[in-house]
Amino acid sequence: QTMNNYIVKPLGDMYLEDVTADDIRLAMIPLASKSAGLYSKVNMLLKCVFYSAERSQLLEYNPCEGLSAKGGKPGKKINALTDEQVKLLLDTVRGLPPYTFIMIALYSGLRREEILGLQWDCVCLDVPTPYISVRRAWRSENNRPVISTTLKTKAARRDIPIPKCLTDCLREVKEKTESEYVVADRNGNPLSSSQFQRVWKYVTVRSTKPHNYYKYVNGQCVKCTVTPTPGSHQKNNPKLVYAIDFDVTPHQLRHTYITNLLYAGVDPKTVQYLAGHENSKTTMDIYAQVKYNKPEQLLSVVNAAFAPSAGA
């Protein structure tokens, strides 16, 4: 998908030898507003294509020479949810479509594509140590779900022991479904991209963040904004309570799982395996945030490091 959107579309109709450095720079312009990770990925793919062509003597000139590896917007810092926020989130969506997805993300740390591709043959509940095997991944093509055994990385293939709260939740879900997918639509099929967005909307509509809506005034469409107060009800749907007064995203649930493991003292190498991180740097960056983000706990260490020597 990345290759199609950012390389094939702008450059796909050209011959390799006709591509200039200006063409490459023009192709990279839309990526300036995207994440630094996506920019780096496209940058790497382009360089792989043209350096390979150069080595095969298909090109006399490599248009990627001098292409900066830095670009895109730096990623926003992701904060793990607190225990209180986790409880509030689960209480708010209990019995609603996103509940199972949220439970799996919070208590097994699976990525979104791993949860949406999860089938019951990879959920082992009736064993002494219940666990989930990650063997498939979901992706969307033209808003159609595609389930593949090709995972994000080799490290993504893993077996994750799950706690009792998630085991009980999955047992209950399994008893009520005939689908082979753990998270499925009403027909038992894996969710499409738009279906998942609708499922997640059950979370966002219960947020106390300002909501925009439109209404007609004197024949004109006017944009209005309402800022709900926690505990208030939606005017047109009294059953809907605005309760979530914090930001929450699907990836944040996985980040919370990893953070909680580190807070519990699980060694980073084990966390790396459970999270499916191929690069230990990803795990260690989170570890550093967890270990070194409380100045009061570091005060004694800093004081000891800079204490005057006995002979001074």
Language model feature labels by segment:
Residues 1-60, 75-77, 189-195, 212-214, ...:
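N-terminal core-binding DNA-recognition domain of tyrosine site-specific recombinases/integrases
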Residues 17-22, 51-73, 224-232, 300:
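Short, charged hinge/linker segments at domain and secondary-structure junctions
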Residues 36, 87, 91-96, 108, ...:
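Short, basic (Lys/Arg/His-rich) helix/loop patches that form interaction surfaces
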Residues 36-44, 55-120, 126-128, 155-157, ...:
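Basic, Lys/Arg- and aromatic-enriched nucleic-acid-binding interface segment
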Residues 68-69, 85, 118-175:
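Conserved tyrosine-mediated DNA breakage-rejoining catalytic core shared by Y-recombinases
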Residues 80, 138, 167, 275-300:
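Catalytic-site neighborhood detector that most strongly recognizes the C-terminal catalytic loop/helix
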Residues 122-131, 247, 266-286:
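Short, polar N-cap/turn motifs at the start of nucleic acid-interacting alpha helices
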Residues 127-128, 140-157, 164-166, 187, ...:
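C-terminal secondary-structure termini that scaffold catalytic or DNA-interacting sites
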